[in-house]
């Protein structure tokens, strides 16, 4: 009747992969969280479910398309494999871009503020990522470089990969833990009324996730590349830059220095390559933290606004 394996469970002969179960669980928890928050954002009670039904299919298609585009060599000889999602192959940034487009279209059709809808979606998205990342654990993917020090060969710092019988840095766990922290911070700051304007929850999601992804992506061995550039790192820094530009525009001429916010993170990518060490150095962590501090200072209102 039931048979459990490393990455799936067989129910009456039907194989159900844990990856899909965890993605579905992340979606469900995200929808429930949105349903609890929509009233606070002055949105109709059906908004959360509407966004889930409309955005999720678009996000999945775009997440898969994004991944396939950058891994075309693996699919060009077997096009039908593009539709096989049981072994993973979904890009979070592709899903975010597709979901954002769907939210924008929905906002135009329903005549609701796009940024309010984005604020509603952001914590739910982070929660879905936090849960869904555990699908990478069962699929044994999205891990980092091999661990050479015996003292680091234990979970959650590292994970044992069956394919090469080697311990690797558990980058999926790092991202999952950080995304849970993002959810907690966004909800805490929202409750404490730290966010002042429409779109702030979404913008801070982009900053917090963007910096984490830029840092952790450097540890991974399966990054998507465009030439020599890790695509996710480039998009992460562009997202941080875009948000800092929004903060700068809000503050007028006093905020233009905010455009320099991403520079420490960029310096971390260039000057402290994780490929050489396999892990983040204290200098790299300090530079990413400095970018976060700059963004926070840029977000604070100018003295004339206080």
Residue ranges of each PLM-predicted region?
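A feature for loop-to-transmembrane-helix boundaries and adjacent hydrophobic helices
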Residues: 1-306
């Amino acid at each position: 009747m039931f048979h459990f394996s490393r990455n799936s469970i067989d129910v009456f002969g039907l194989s159900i992969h844990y990856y899909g179960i965890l993605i579905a669980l992340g979606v469900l928890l995200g929808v429930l969280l949105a349903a609890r928050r929509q009233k606070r954002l002055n949105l109709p009670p059906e908004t959360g479910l509407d966004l889930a039904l409309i955005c999720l299919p678009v996000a999945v298609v775009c997440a898969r398309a994004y991944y396939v585009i950058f891994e075309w060599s693996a699919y060009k000889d077997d096009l039908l494999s593009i539709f096989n999602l049981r072994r993973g192959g979904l890009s979070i940034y592709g899903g975010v871009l597709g979901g954002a487009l769907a939210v924008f279209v929905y906002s135009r059709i329903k005549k609701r503020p796009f940024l309010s809808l984005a604020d509603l979606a952001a914590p739910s998205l982070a929660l879905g990522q936090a849960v869904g990342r555990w699908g990478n654990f069962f699929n044994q993917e999205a891990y980092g470089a091999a661990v050479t020090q015996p003292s680091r060969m234990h979970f959650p710092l590292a994970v044992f990969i069956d394919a090469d019988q080697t311990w690797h840095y558990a980058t999926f766990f790092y991202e999952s833990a950080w995304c849970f922290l993002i959810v907690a911070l966004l909800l805490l700051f929202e409750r404490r009324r730290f966010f002042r304007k429409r779109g702030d929850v979404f913008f801070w999601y982009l900053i917090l996730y963007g910096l984490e992804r830029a840092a952790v992506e450097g540890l991974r061995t399966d990054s998507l590349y465009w030439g020599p550039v890790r695509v996710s790192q480039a998009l992460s820094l562009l997202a941080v830059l875009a948000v800092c530009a929004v903060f700068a525009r809000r503050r007028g001429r006093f905020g233009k220095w905010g455009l320099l916010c991403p520079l420490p993170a960029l310096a971390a990518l260039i000057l402290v390559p994780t490929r050489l060490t396999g892990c983040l150095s204290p200098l790299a962590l300090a530079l990413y933290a400095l970018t976060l501090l700059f963004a926070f200072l840029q977000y604070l209102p100018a003295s004339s606004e206080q």
